[in-house]
């Protein structure tokens, strides 16, 4: 409909739309954090490449661990392909759950790291009385589905959106193996959830 208003002696006509629209709810997408994985062969080097975008074990509202299982399947495939190097692309990974991070690291680390200290969860003074501290260890081979790659080193691609559990990967594997970081400075949010 048209409305007439007066401003400064001029007539101004405005078109006003008063139509409401109903739309059905959009379908929920299940987007796996494993964006892509591939094998690159260069002479004797068999390089696994993985773009991993979030440390989630399953989609919101689910309790089936399907994303962790997909991650294990990728590493089982890497193991079948006998990769001897890994490029882990975390440029767009803002973090996620520490347990999923621990799973990923347990599949990357040298076998000698399995069962060793992965991280120690310490809480602030207010919560320390309630929770104390928890020592988390790299998972044993049986808990990673036989998918430990026993790698000698890791290459991690980083960017300004690399944060939290992504930084935990870098910092917590370094005591056990060389981790080569390629890219820009990470966000600097080295905390877990």
Spans of features found by a protein language model:
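Extracytoplasmic/secreted envelope proteins and their assembly/folding machinery
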Residues: 68-75, 89, 101-105, 154, ...
């Amino acid at each position: 409909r048209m409305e007439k208003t007066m401003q400064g002696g001029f007539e101004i006509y405005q078109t006003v739309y008063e139509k409401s629209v109903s739309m059905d709810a959009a379908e929920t997408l299940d987007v796996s954090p494993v964006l892509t994985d591939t094998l690159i062969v260069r002479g004797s080097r068999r390089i696994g490449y993985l773009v991993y975008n979030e440390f989630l074990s399953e989609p919101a509202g689910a309790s089936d661990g399907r994303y962790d299982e997909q991650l294990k399947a990728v590493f089982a495939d890497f193991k079948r392909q006998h990769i001897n190097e890994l490029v882990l692309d975390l440029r767009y990974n803002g973090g996620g759950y520490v347990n999923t991070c621990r799973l990923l690291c347990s599949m990357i680390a040298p076998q000698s790291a399995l069962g060793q200290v992965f991280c120690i969860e310490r809480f602030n003074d207010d919560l320390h009385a309630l929770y104390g501290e928890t020592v988390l260890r790299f998972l044993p081979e049986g808990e990673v589905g036989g998918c430990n790659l026993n790698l000698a080193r890791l290459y991690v691609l980083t960017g300004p959106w690399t944060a939290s559990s992504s930084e935990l990967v870098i910092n917590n594997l370094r005591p056990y193996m060389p981790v080569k970081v390629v890219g820009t400075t990470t966000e600097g949010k080295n905390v877990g959830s």
